[in-house]
């Protein structure tokens, strides 16, 4: 492991256009569960399968049940950026890392100080009225009734990409552009099981594609 860490450090030192592509495993030390591990979100008991709840059809059919799940499982009180988030932000400040492409919706990369973050699946910290488009923060909707509603009467929806919904085109294009231009692509905290997001690494054209464990990343 020491040899792998030293090689990773060496490549980082030699690179000046690094992109990090990450998933839920990056945030587990912050107390946020991943999805597919033994203790992950998809293996926890709930009234409906999480994959069903996290779908556009279910949100429209039963927003009250969706928000019960959202408040209890997706919004984790007290979650703070961990050493991995902070290290990536540091690499950006050093001029090494040009972008973070994340499948996470927890906003921890931004809170750690990273500026150029592409949140493929959105963020729980952005919420909009489905009727008039008014913006609401995560704190706003947590203080509302079970189904948050706008002053206009419309249902407020988190800016989270649910099953049956497409990725934001601008976010997707930005992520692809950075991955294509990268001289080093670090992949961590993801099983690469969710498409189309997982397919983005196929756009990498360099020869330094580095899958890392959490231990490597925080070193």
Locations of regions flagged by a protein language model:
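Conserved catalytic core of sirtuin-type NAD+-dependent deacylases
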Residues: 1-218
């Amino acid at each position: 492991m020491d040899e792998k860490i030293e090689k990773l450090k060496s490549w980082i030192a030699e690179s000046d256009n690094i992109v990090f592509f990450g998933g839920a495993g990056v945030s587990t030390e912050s107390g946020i569960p991943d999805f597919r591990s033994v203790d992950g979100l998809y293996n926890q008991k709930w009234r409906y399968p999480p994959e069903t709840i996290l779908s556009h059809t279910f949100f429209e059919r039963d927003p009250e049940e969706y928000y019960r799940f959202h408040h209890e499982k997706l919004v984790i009180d007290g979650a703070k950026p961990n050493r991995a988030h902070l290290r990536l932000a540091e690499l950006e400040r050093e001029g090494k890392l040009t972008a973070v492409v994340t499948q996470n919706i927890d906003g921890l990369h931004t809170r750690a100080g990273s500026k150029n973050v592409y949140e493929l699946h959105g963020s729980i910290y952005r919420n909009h009225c489905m009727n008039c488009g008014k913006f609401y923060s995560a704190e706003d909707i947590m203080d509302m009734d079970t189904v948050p509603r706008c002053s206009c009467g419309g249902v407020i929806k988190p800016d989270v990409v649910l099953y049956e919904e497409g990725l934001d085109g601008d976010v997707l294009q930005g992520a692809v552009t950075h991955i294509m231009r990268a001289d080093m692509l670090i992949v961590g905290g993801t099983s690469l099981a969710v498409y189309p997001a997982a397919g983005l690494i196929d756009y990498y054209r360099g020869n330094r594609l580095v899958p890392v464990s959490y231990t490597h990343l925080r070193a």
